Curated annotation (Swiss-Prot):
Reaction center is composed of four bacteriochlorophylls, two bacteriopheophytins, two ubiquinones, one iron, and three highly hydrophobic polypeptide chains (designated L, M, and H). The gene is pufL. Belongs to the reaction center PufL/M/PsbA/D family. Fe cation binds at residues 191, 231. It is found in: Cellular chromatophore membrane. InterPro entries: Photo_II_D1/D2_sf, Photo_RC_L, Photo_RC_L/M, Photo_RC_L/M_CS. The reaction center is a membrane-bound complex that mediates the initial photochemical event in the electron transfer process of photosynthesis. This is Reaction center protein L chain. PROSITE patterns: REACTION_CENTER. A ubiquinone binds at residue 217. (7R,8Z)-bacteriochlorophyll b binds at residues 154, 174. It is a multi-pass membrane protein.
Length: 276
């Protein structure tokens, strides 16, 4: 595959974390590196085990395939392969692949001499996954509290986990997480539409620049965060949504086991209006 005009000067030796020059090469447009190799190995292992688990199941129908965690009776012990052991090894493989990919991103950043914002942000996604399949189950004492790897069974797990606490929408951390996810979508939509509107003027008009973009929001809401600032805002909003989603799940089960609607009874007992 032909290189773009600017690519060759960035394909330089160095910046690797492990392996030195051994895996310091590209395959087509893709940088390999030591962690590219480990990503591939973990991915192949995990995928092969998923296929094995599907073969043990009742059907090859996509919607019915499910790799289930061990029964809670196994606690945190290693389960037999057909009774949850596959899920445990697949989970380990997934974490290995995700972390390897993040470290590969670090190596690419080092080669380009740029900041580590991308692997840092991706690390929050990894943490969200680990919180569901490792941290929360460990805090609750059994791998069986992790979610199954299957289309319908995963949806069932989400529904059942919510109903275990009466109504998950009353979880305050869930409220904040969902609000931040929607706010992130709004910020990205506003930013994207502004850039497209400035870059696609009417016929005969010149392409507009940051001055027009800033002025639009100053005229609309009285303030513009700026071209660099909107990306900081977007990153902060997105990572905050992930953080509160993690807190939401860690609270439910390991810390609080009651009904989330009942949790709000403290509000009714505040002395400002509680005269009973």
């Amino acid at each position: 595959m032909a290189l773009l005009s600017f690519e060759r000067k960035y394909r330089v030796r160095g910046g690797t974390l492990i392996g030195g020059d051994l895996f310091d090469f590209w395959v087509g447009p893709f940088y390999v590196g030591f962690f590219g190799v480990t990503t591939l190995l973990f991915t192949v292992l995990g995928t092969a085990l998923i296929v094995w688990g599907a073969a043990l199941g009742p059907s090859w129908t996509f919607w019915q395939i499910s790799i289930n965690p061990p029964d809670v009776s196994y606690g945190l012990a290693m389960a037999p392969m057909a009774k949850g052991g596959l899920w445990q090894i697949i989970t380990f493989s997934a974490i290995g692949a995700f972390v390897s990919w993040a470290l590969r991103e670090v190596e690419i950043c080092r080669k380009l001499g740029i900041g580590y914002h991308i692997p840092f942000a991706f690390g929050f996604a990894i943490l969200a996954y680990v919180s569901l399949v490792v941290i929360r189950p460990v805090m609750m004492g059994a791998w069986g509290y992790g979610f199954p790897y299957g289309f319908m069974t995963h949806l069932d797990w989400v529904s059942n986990t919510g109903y275990q606490y009466a109504n998950f929408h009353y979880n305050p951390a869930h409220m904040l997480g969902i609000t931040l996810f929607f706010t992130t979508c709004l910020a990205l939509a506003l930013h994207g539409s502004l850039i497209l509107s400035a870059a696609n003027p009417g016929k005969g008009e010149v392409v507009k620049g940051p001055e027009h973009e800033n002025t639009y929001f100053q005229d609309t809401i009285g303030y513009s965060v700026g071209t660099l600032g909107i990306h900081r805002v977007g990153l902060i909003l997105a990572l905050s949504a992930v953080v509160w989603s993690i807190i939401c799940m860690i609270l439910s089960g390991p810390i609080y086991t009651g009904s989330w609607p009942d949790w709000w009874l403290w509000w009714q007992k505040l002395p400002f209006w509680n005269h009973g």
